[in-house]
């Protein structure tokens, strides 16, 4: 009878120890990098990016943006963003490509700490400047066509022209 009780006590103790060890968190463990980073909005001087939230307590998100994919240029910036899965990034130039990474850390700091786990870089693009309408000039005309010129908009790779026939 004593052996059965001892076995039961040992089984309960092993079970309790297993639960304690399973719930133990390594305070020095690095957080996971966010996935699913994508651009969702663009303005002439800003972009908005979203990502899948990392399921961990006390996460602090950071972003960094650069005009080169290796983040070696002097334009690299980082900014703290607590408990959010979207960030508005401003202060960019119109019609230009940038690279953005989202990072996570449990360290709360004004800039990204050394233990930040960074996502893969994505390319984001700001909206090009608009063509100033008074810069559009007719440079030629034929019986069925016209030629136009205008001052190029910074960062534009195509233009949409809308023509109206006047007097009808």
Feature map (PLM): residue ranges:
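N-terminal secretory signal peptides that target proteins for export/translocation
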Residues: 1-5
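Bacterial N-terminal signal peptides
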Residues: 12-22
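Pro/Thr/Ser/Gly-rich low-complexity, intrinsically disordered linker/stalk tracts
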Residues: 28-57, 94, 111-155
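An aromatic-rich alpha-helical recognition segment common to small helix-rich domains
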Residues: 34, 51, 63-65, 89, ...
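Extracellular low-complexity, O-glycosylation-prone stalks/linkers
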Residues: 55-76, 153-168
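Short, tandemly repeated low-complexity microdomains enriched for cysteine and small residues
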Residues: 74-78, 114-115
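Short S/T/G- and acidic-enriched coil/turn segments that sit immediately N-terminal to beta-strands
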Residues: 82-87
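Beta-strand-rich modules
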Residues: 89-110
